[in-house]
Amino acid sequence: MEETDIAKLSEEEYNEEEDEDFDPTKGTAVAGAEVSDGEDDDEDDEDDSRVKDSYSHIVSESGGLVKTRRARQQEEEFKRKNKYEGIVEAAISEKVGSIWEDLKKESLSRLHNKENDSVISESSKLKKDNHVAGEEMVTIERVYKFAGETIREKKTVPISSAEAVEYLNNLKFRKSTDQAGSTKRKLEEIDVKENNNTNEDTSESGIDRKKLRRPLKRPPFLEQIISGALKPKLSTLEKSKLDWATYVDKEGINDELSAHNKDGYLAKQDFLNKVDSVKENEYKELRRKEMMIRLQETK
């Protein structure tokens, strides 16, 4: 009796709203657990399909789509192929038109100036030719061996040309060698005569002439070249020198080279040094005069 009374009293005194541990959804959650399992499987399949679709539209932190390498290549190729499709022809402004006209006028003026320059250069060439025609000419003849070949040259050039100067210098050198060779030959002839006289004397005295005969000398190399027995071989340095002289005459830059050569440069430097020394002397003289004036004022 007492237990039943306590249970009745507890049921009457119990209030669900005052009970903090009471959860009315517990009973329904257990009952609907089996039903919800099937629904969860369907939702998982839908989520997987959504994830697969979303990989093609990945959004970066800044909000734009993140493109794959293939997508970027396709986009660049598309832009390259269709880069001229979006160009719109617009009317040319007056400013651009005026600039274009100015450029055309400038190009025409340049062409006109070039024609004038060509006419002037032709006239200067004619003047040079006329000047050369009135000048004394020199005929240059050369026969030499170069690179195993015998080369023959014959040309007529003005006497003031670089090639003519080089040729005349070579002639002077050859003349000097000729004179040296002739003096050598004379000395050798005198020696031979003296030897003959001594041989005659020794023959009279009974000494064998063959033993006292001097052996014949080989003729000098320069004498062979002068006599024509040997053709002069031209070295690479001499050939380049001749080619340079020919080029100078062809281009007509002999006067320009003589004006800007080493001697001309040294002369200019000497002149500038003299000018500097004169200025320095004048400055020293002015300083001396100023010092004299100041000394007189202090006295």
Swiss-Prot record:
Q: Which domain of life is it from?
A: Eukaryota
Transmembrane region(s)? none
Give the UniProt keywords, A-Z: Activator, Chromatin regulator, Nucleus, Transcription, Transcription regulation
Composition bias (Acidic residues) maps to: 12-22, 36-48
**Principal subcellular localisation of the protein:** nucleus
Keyword Ion transport listed: no
What is the protein name given in its UniProt record? SWR1-complex protein 5
